[in-house]
Amino acid sequence: MAKIRVISDLPVMDDSGNILHVQELAGNSNESKPTTGMANGSLYLETDTGLISVFDEDDGWGTPQ
């Protein structure tokens, strides 16, 4: 499974519809990683191509949906 590297400050929504910034998810890193305390343990990343990836705490990285 490929890791997803965030190369810009893309908008990220949790599954409650709250918009987060990449820095809040990955700190100073360029890689987006799952965080704890999110609703249902999942994050949804919408890229500039419109794809949505789901980050799950169990497998660590997301699969494009």
Each language-model region and where it sits:
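Extracellular/surface-exposed low-complexity repeats and stalk/linker segments enriched in Gly/Pro
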Residues: A2-L43, T47-L51, D59-Q65
